[in-house]
């Protein structure tokens, strides 16, 4: 009798549990509650593992990592978790700037903080710095420990150029020195001799440190590809490589002389260059907008300024230098030639893209009218204008850089285990790339910055610079 009563009790408890579960389900409650620090609810997730959107999702963050993603029917945040209501917005990975410049240590603390925040304000959560300085190691540690607000940093070395490296022995010495210092890659610049470049490449392979950046004119594109340069930035030396061997000038023409080559380039060589790039596995970081604004421009500073209101977040003396650089360049070059060079660069980029080359997004900020973070949106818009799909552009701004760094398990997607480096935007970027700029907020390593907080900080910066 007692056993029967216990059995009846267990059955009744089971029925009550089922009834409660049925009521919770009928009322729309989630099946599982997840503990964490912060949870996004009512968001549409762009995972960036492929071109699809996960609608009405809950994303839970703990200790700076994504720990759970699921539909609102399946999971929800436990009581006490801070909730960010996405209000049907779109949650995507943070952007990666693959050719950025970090604040000069000679700048004031305010200017340093401002430059770093400009990246974050625009959803740029990782930056590959391409002009090294010893002060950047401290900056990186301050960011890692939350003492300074800024993106995750990968540090390029002090410039390997002709002034610092004149012979092969110096190249070998610098490579070993920068590896020990802790730089993530070697920044290659102009002026290296063929011998010094080969010594750099051989020593870099020996000590296991990648190198990238410019292609020294004396070396040339094909040699750089052959010896394993990891990235070629600015499409450096691609136009020169389109000149047939029989017409190669006796000495390098340099950046300012590229226009002279337009009469002798042979675009039929482009497919061979694309194939060589793909076979080498080299990454290309084109920095298109800067080059068309500063070097192969057909517009003066007044017109550029009218399209770049974000210059109000830069020191006025910096903007004045930019104005002078653009106008001086326009006065000393032929606009038609600039237009032809820019068009050929666009053709090279699209040939590389369509041929399957590795491409990553970079802007060379802060340089001439390329304001950190904001310049990323201009660069992405241009790529779509040239014929890439929004998804393809987002790939090269998020997941593909993580592949470059061999860090696909760490960042570049919205997935469990990834860093909580996220950008919340109000419209679907797959439909219009300009929606990436319509931020509702940014999460940086698990720390949330609402659009209001970002806008207030930007307003303070503008006032600080007298705008």
Q: What is the meaning of each model-derived region?
A:
Residues 23-26:
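C-terminal motif of bacterial Sec signal peptides marking the signal peptidase cleavage site
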Residues 45-58, 71-74, 371, 389-394, ...:
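Acidic, glycine-enriched loop/beta-strand segments at the rims
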């Amino acid at each position: 009798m007692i056993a029967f009563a216990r059995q009846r009790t267990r059955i009744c408890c089971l029925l009550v549990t089922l009834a409660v579960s049925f009521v919770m389900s009928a009322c729309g409650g989630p099946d599982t509650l997840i503990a964490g620090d912060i949870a996004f609810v009512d968001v549409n997730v762009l995972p960036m593992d492929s071109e699809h959107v996960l609608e009405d999702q809950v994303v839970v963050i703990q200790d700076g990592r994504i720990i759970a993603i699921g539909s609102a029917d399946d999971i929800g945040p436990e009581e006490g978790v801070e909730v960010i209501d996405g209000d049907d917005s779109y949650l995507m990975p943070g952007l990666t700037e693959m050719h950025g410049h970090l604040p000069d240590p000679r700048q004031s603390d305010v200017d340093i903080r401002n430059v770093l925040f400009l990246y974050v304000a625009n959803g740029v959560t990782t930056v590959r710095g391409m002009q090294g300085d010893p002060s950047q190691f401290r900056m990186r540690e301050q960011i890692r420990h939350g003492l300074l607000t800024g993106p995750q940093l990968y540090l390029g070395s002090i410039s390997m150029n002709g002034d610092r490296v004149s012979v092969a022995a110096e190249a070998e010495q610098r490579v070993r020195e920068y590896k020990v210092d802790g730089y993530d890659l070697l920044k290659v610049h102009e002026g290296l001799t063929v011998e010094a470049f080969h010594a750099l490449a051989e020593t870099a392979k020996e000590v296991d440190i990648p190198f990238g950046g410019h292609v020294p004119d004396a070396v040339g594109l094909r040699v750089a590809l052959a010896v394993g340069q990891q990235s070629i930035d600015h499409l450096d030396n691609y136009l020169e490589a389109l000149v047939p061997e029989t017409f190669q000038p006796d000495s390098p023409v340099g950046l300012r002389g590229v226009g002279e080559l337009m009469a002798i380039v042979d675009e039929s060589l482009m497919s061979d260059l694309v194939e060589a790039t793909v076979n080498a596995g080299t990454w290309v970081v084109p920095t298109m907008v800067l080059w068309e604004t500063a070097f192969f421009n057909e517009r003066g500073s007044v017109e550029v300024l009218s399209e770049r209101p974000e210059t109000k977040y830069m020191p006025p003396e910096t903007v004045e230098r930019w104005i002078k650089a653009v106008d001086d360049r326009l006065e000393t070059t032929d606009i038609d030639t600039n237009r032809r060079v820019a068009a050929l660069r666009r053709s090279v980029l699209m040939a590389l893209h369509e041929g399957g080359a590795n491409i990553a997004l970079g802007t060379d900020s802060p340089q001439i009218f390329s304001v950190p973070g904001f310049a990323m949106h201009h660069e992405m818009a241009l790529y779509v204008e040239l014929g890439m799909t929004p998804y393809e552009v987002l790939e090269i701004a998020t997941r593909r850089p993580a592949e470059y760094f061999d860090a696909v398990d760490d960042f570049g997607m919205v997935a469990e285990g990834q860093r909580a480096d996220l950008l919340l935007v109000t419209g679907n970027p797959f439909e219009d790339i300009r929606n990436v700029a319509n931020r509702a907020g940014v999460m940086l390593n698990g720390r949330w910055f609402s659009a209001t907080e970002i806008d207030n900080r930007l307003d303070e910066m503008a006032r600080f610079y007298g705008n």
